[in-house]
Amino acid sequence: MKPTMFVCGKQSVEKTELIRTVIHTFPSSPLYNTSGNELFETPVVDFVEANSSDTNKIPVPDEAHAIWFCIDGGASMFSQEEADSIKSLDERALVVVTKSESLNEDQIKSLMDILLGFVSRDQIVLVSVDKKSGLPCLVNRTKKIIGNSLKNLSSSFFPSRFDREWDRFFSRRLQLWSQKNEEEANSYITWAAGRAAAIAIVPLPLADVTPLVANEIYMIYRLAGVYGIANDQSLISMIIGCTGGSLVGKLGSSFLPFLKIPIAAAVTYGVGKAAKAFFESGMELNGDTLLEIFEKAKDEASGLFW
């Protein structure tokens, strides 16, 4: 049995563009009699796009094995109708925030404050069709949801065969997207470390700590966006806490700029590398591993010219 993906949301949320980017195909023919639904066929999964503009009247078919409920990251806020629809979603659903490249740090905070009150963090994915960010996360989480649905519906389901066919279809795409994501993530880390070095030039004791911490937080938000992760303050605090990346403690004994600059840059670089690895893993790395990655990257960065 070939699984079915149901993709819904308002017209402006780039549903069609997202599907085409993920599977590189065009709609073949209407699947249902309901107006506007179109079928995108692949060897491993069929995508059904609902083109209804009214989110309250989108009939999610019972046979759908997974659901993408798309909302527009480029909008200032989603509607009450969308909020009501999100509240009613079950475990088959992912809330897909499109146009994530247009979101700034404050907008991400506001959005996550609302969405995390409706669904779990694992059910939220931020994606950008233009930058290809978040696509590996979206595909991998969709695979897991479909696998669980098939297992629950059929005793004859063979996970190994499904995994093999899915991986064969998506492997090249995942490789290209992941490479692009890694390049973008590394550029954010290098930029943030260089910015930390510039901030640390301030000669006053601890006057630079607040902007340095803000720089770290901004970097982590950007990295989370690259990998499609629903980020908030609790996740940031966990990452910084696990890496032992307290800039206050590390800079407290170094008031001279020529001493602070390499410390600030190296700590920021280390936190960035640890956060990147954490998001790449799908948030599965433990604290000890994060600390190990942080220390190794910090030591490497200490030898660089900032």
Identify the role of each PLM range.
Residues 170-197:
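Basic/polar, acidic-poor N-terminal "presequence/leader" segments
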Residues 55-123:
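Conserved C-terminal guanine-recognition region of P-loop GTPase G domains, centered on the G4
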Residues 39, 47, 123-126, 201:
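Conserved beta-strand scaffold positions in the cores of enzyme catalytic domains, especially
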Residues 262-306:
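Charge-biased C-terminal accessory regions appended to nucleic-acid-, cytoskeletal NTPase
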Residues 144-176, 180, 283:
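C-terminal helical "lid" subdomain and adjoining coupling/linker elements of P-loop NTPases
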Residues 189-274:
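Membrane-inserting effector segments that mediate pore formation, membrane fusion
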Residues 1-50, 221, 227-230, 273-275, ...:
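Conserved G1/Walker A P-loop phosphate-binding module
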